């Protein structure tokens, strides 16, 4: 009877061993598996996932992260997932600390974070994991923390590859300029630092006579950047190889477009629409890229699977492929998947 089968499936008393064996034999024969999702819905438990990310404007890197986060939650509709996003100013430490305090106040079931402020992130993660709250990282992962999963590009290797793409075909290059974001009092981003280290390692291995000159540009002030680029290349007219280790190569390509400059090779990172448009028009020569939105999606999905199914990802550290984009293949990446 249905009642007997129900008692066997839920390990209740009142069933003989002979009957229990018959029921399990039939279950194994037909390949029955319990509907885990139906069981979850019947429990009516809500799960709160907190995501801590910087404020962003349309077209910026963090919009890709946001899109991946929200897509993962939308695809899990019906599983009682409550998403709370705490935004902060990535150039202000106190703003990040406020997002951390908000997270602790909420007492979430899981945390998604891209660490920018390393020490504060470590303190937050230590607090949460001491309460058995799982954490998923993207971009970078600070050492000495427990976490469920990490999704991101192999950063050092991407910097090494970038150097090969930029100067590998021309061993006579004597100087490369790196323009990176002036972060004020905020610490350098670990992802840019690791790419920078990889780039220098390549030069040391393959072109030790080439120097890398570092300059800071503004993330927001267009006129300041125009003056900066004008002044630098007036003083360094022979420098023809340019790199930025963050997602803002389009700031440099805008200057090149306005000034009509076509004799320089610019390499950048990340598949922002502005970068990809510049790649198409030739002001950016190469983009080294990852699928940021997919990484954010997978990170949040790993948290949901753990909360709902108690399922850990197959791997703790999940490194994405490194995509090399040129004007000849960029159209295939402009299509939304």
Give the ranges of each region predicted by the language model.
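Hinge/beta->alpha junction and helix N-cap segments in small-molecule ligand-binding domains
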Residues: 54-63, 85-95, 152-158, 180-198, ...
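N-terminal helix-turn-helix DNA-binding module of bacterial transcription factors
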Residues: 1-44
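Flexible loop/hinge segments that line or gate small-molecule binding clefts
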Residues: 120-157, 272-280
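Amphipathic helical "hinge" segments at domain boundaries
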Residues: 35-94
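Hinge/cleft segment of the Venus flytrap/periplasmic-binding protein
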Residues: 26, 30, 186-187, 203, ...
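Proline-centered loop/turn at the N-terminus of a beta-strand
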Residues: 110, 132-136, 149, 175, ...
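Hydrophobic alpha-helical segments within soluble ligand-binding/sensing domains
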Residues: 150-176, 225-226, 275, 291-308
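Hydrophobic alpha-helical
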Residues: 110-129, 213-274
């Amino acid at each position: 009877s249905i009642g007997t089968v129900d008692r066997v499936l839920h390990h209740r008393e009142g069933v003989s061993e002979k009957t229990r064996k018959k029921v399990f034999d039939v279950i194994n024969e037909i390949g029955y598996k319990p509907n885990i999702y139906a069981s979850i819905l019947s429990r009516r438990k809500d799960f709160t996932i907190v995501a801590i990310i910087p404020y962003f404007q349309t077209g910026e890197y963090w919009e890709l992260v946001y899109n991946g986060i929200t897509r993962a939650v939308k695809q899990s509709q019906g599983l009682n997932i409550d998403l709370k996003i705490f935004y902060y100013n990535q150039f202000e430490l106190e703003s990040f600390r406020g997002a951390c305090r908000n997270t602790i106040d909420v007492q979430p079931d899981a945390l998604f974070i891209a660490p920018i402020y390393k020490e504060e992130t470590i303190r937050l993660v230590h607090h949460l994991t001491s309460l058995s709250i799982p954490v998923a990282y993207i971009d970078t992962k600070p050492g000495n923390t427990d976490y469920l999963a990490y999704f991101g590009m192999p950063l050092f290797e991407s910097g090494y590859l970038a150097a090969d793409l930029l100067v590998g075909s021309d061993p006579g290059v004597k100087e490369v300029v790196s323009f990176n974001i002036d972060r004020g009092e905020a610490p350098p981003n670990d992802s840019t630092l690791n790419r920078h280290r990889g780039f220098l390692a390549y030069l040391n291995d393959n072109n030790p006579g080439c120097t890398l000159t570092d300059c800071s540009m503004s993330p927001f002030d267009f006129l300041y950047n125009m003056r900066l680029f004008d002044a630098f290349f007036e003083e360094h007219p022979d420098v023809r190889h340019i790199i930025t280790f963050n997602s803002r190569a389009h700031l440099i390509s805008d200057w090149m477009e306005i000034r009509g400059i076509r004799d320089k090779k610019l390499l950048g990172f990340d598949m922002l629409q502005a970068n990809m448009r510049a790649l198409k028009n030739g002001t950016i020569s190469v983009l080294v890229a990852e699928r940021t939105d997919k990484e954010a999606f997978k990170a949040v999905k790993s948290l949901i699977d753990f909360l709902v199914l108690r399922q850990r990802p197959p791997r703790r550290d999940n490194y994405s492929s490194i995509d090399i984009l040129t004007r000849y293949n960029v159209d295939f990446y402009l299509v939304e998947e």
